[in-house]
């Protein structure tokens, strides 16, 4: 498991109050983890802060699963 993956999982667990075992790469933020639209926006902001990066709104809308977030961050991390 990469450092990015660990941090993303920790942020999701903290924000959505779910068990780490529920946070898989395939888990959908809304369908599987119970996030509403505000939770999702706040998660993206938390990812931006944690990884010191910007996630444009059009890209954030495409990030629907934990794996999507990990892949996006790893690809765009400076």
From Swiss-Prot:
SUPFAM superfamilies: ACP-like. The modification O-(pantetheine 4'-phosphoryl)serine is found at residue 37. One of its GO terms (molecular function) is acyl carrier activity. One of its GO terms (cellular component) is membrane. It is found in: Cytoplasm. PANTHER family: ACYL CARRIER PROTEIN, CARRIER DOMAIN-CONTAINING PROTEIN. Carrier of the growing fatty acid chain in fatty acid biosynthesis. Belongs to the acyl carrier protein (ACP) family. This is Acyl carrier protein. The gene is acpP.
């Amino acid at each position: 498991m990469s450092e990015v993956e660990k941090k993303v999982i920790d942020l999701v667990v903290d924000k959505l109050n779910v068990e780490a075992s529920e946070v898989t790469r395939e888990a959908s933020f809304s369908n599987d983890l119970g996030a509403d639209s505000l939770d999702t926006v706040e998660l993206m902001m938390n990812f931006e802060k944690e990884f010191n990066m910007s996630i444009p709104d059009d890209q954030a809308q495409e990030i629907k699963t934990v794996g999507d977030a990990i892949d996006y961050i790893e690809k765009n991390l400076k």
